Amino acid sequence: MKDTIRQLIQQALTRLVTEGVLPEGLTPAIQVENARDKTHGDFASNIAMMLAKPAGMKPRDLAEKLIAALPSDEQVSKVEIAGPGFLNFFQNTAALAARLDAALADAHLSVRKAGAVQRVVVDLSAPNLAKEMHVGHLRSTIIGDGVANVLTFLGDTVIRQNHVGDWGTQFGMLLAYLQEKPATSDELSDLENFYRAAKQRFDESEEFAERARGLVVKLQAGDAECLALWTRFKDISLSHCQETYERLNVKLTPADVMGESAYNDDLANVVNDLKATGLLVESNGAQCVFLEEFRTADDTPLPVIVQKAGGGYLYATTDLAAIRYRSKVLKADRVLYFVDQRQALHFQQVFEVARRAGFVHDGMQLEHMGFGTMNGADGRPFKTRDGGTVKLIDLLDEAEERAYTLVKEKNPEVAEAELRSIAKAVGISAVKYADLSKHRASDYSFNFDQMLSFEGNTAPYLLYAYTRVAGVFRKLGTPFDASKGQIVLAAPQEQELAARLAQFTETLNNVAEKGTPHVLCAYLYDLAGLFSSFYENCPILGAENPDQQQSRLRLAALTGRTLKQGLDLLGLETLERM
């Protein structure tokens, strides 16, 4: 609807320019927002106030001329001037109802992408291997997956890339420890303890550390024995990761893994190609690119080091190789990096080097979707009581157990198997939603009690809202798509719910553009609240007549399908009853 209003305003502006009311050459960004007070309309624009000065007119006078120049449209019932010159647009409820009927008849809920579809690479999760995933990996994994789901739903071709840390000095350390203490498969499967023991030896023994560094060199040189052991470690790590992904209900698979090691053979080429473009400068033996716009505190250019003096490569080198691969091989139009926002400078520099070196094709978008940290109740990064990192799988186990206790208290008569199934959905969804509902750039404090509450903007509240809708149809013994007739919007609660349902497409396009799943969370929470008001004030099963009942059933059905689709895009499992 906002796009329709923008188009109407643009047509009015063009007409006023033709008539000489407005000067030529104006290219304003036409803003259309949801009206705060629905008695004053559904949407508002400040376009008259924006253009009053160049037009040499008072805002309200220009607003009158804009209204006179607006083309008629069946979706708009009237336009009024408010305050200093706002244009307030009222939706035509009959046209709105027809749009909802069309959405209900469409398997895709009439959702369409704003603009052309693209090939989008989503870089997400990317844990360092040789250790189990910890809570710090949660945000990249689920935010990236949620955005990837939305992009796919809108029609983009999405290529997930799990840029795991599967190369580096930690593997030399593990290989050295394995030589000292040959381990069984069971011992190796406990990666966390094996890694901890190896790290302790590395820190305590210089001889061990030197041997570990030597094994890294052998590994990088392609030594068959080292490569075989490295592959074993990598496979064990990836199996742990896959177990976690499946618990989290994210769509990452082994086929999406494209780790650091995948680019090893191209790193020398990256350096040589940078040299050929004239971008490389040697500084203290290292190969660097200096970008004038990135400077140190003492105002000297900040280097992007791509090869150390000893010949080793860095993260920047691997990232440049990955960018080139994503451009030349994957043919990406857009690449989204879901990585901690503390890496913002790194990505700004790497993206700029890639552009100057010609590693990206014209029009290719490189976007760092940075995120904040998950903190404990003390506001510091989330840790165990003894100060260690919290395994992600342990966090999910605790979430399920807490959810089980909560659900069993509320439903002691439910069979054990069903209780466990409900607890799994509620517990995992609660952890994910507590994260996804926050702006990704924000830090947040992890709190089990808040996230498992059935009140407020939480997963349990939304899952329960969906079961209320499902319950209506369960009582009737009919599926969502069984209602007939047409939607008629008479009561205020019907109109408010309908207006929000019609904004699903806009919401998803917003998420896709900005990489912000919290926008979808806020929409679903709002929708659930509006359905609750509708349910309480507009009897469905006790409607006044069959036509009214069918209309309200259709509104309920579209609400249920929209809630289910939205939760599914976030990677949350819905339940038919709780």
UniProtKB/Swiss-Prot annotation:
GO terms for cellular component: cytoplasm. It is found in: Cytoplasm. GO terms for biological process: arginyl-tRNA aminoacylation. The keyword tRNA-binding does not apply. It comes from the Bacteria. Keywords: Aminoacyl-tRNA synthetase, ATP-binding, Cytoplasm, Ligase, Nucleotide-binding, Protein biosynthesis. Pfam families: Arg_tRNA_synt_N, DALR_1, tRNA-synt_1d. One of its GO terms (molecular function) is ATP binding. It is an enzyme of class 6 (ligase). Its EC number is 6.1.1.19. A motif ('HIGH' region) lies at residues 127-137. The keyword Acyltransferase does not apply. PROSITE patterns: AA_TRNA_LIGASE_I. It catalyses: tRNA(Arg) + L-arginine + ATP = L-arginyl-tRNA(Arg) + AMP + diphosphate. HAMAP family: Arg_tRNA_synth. PANTHER family: ARGININE--TRNA LIGASE, CYTOPLASMIC, ARGINYL-TRNA SYNTHETASE. Monomer. Belongs to the class-I aminoacyl-tRNA synthetase family. NCBIfam families: argS. This is Arginine--tRNA ligase. It comes from Pseudomonas savastanoi pv. phaseolicola (strain 1448A / Race 6). The lineage of its organism: Bacteria, Pseudomonadati, Pseudomonadota, Gammaproteobacteria, Pseudomonadales. The gene is argS.
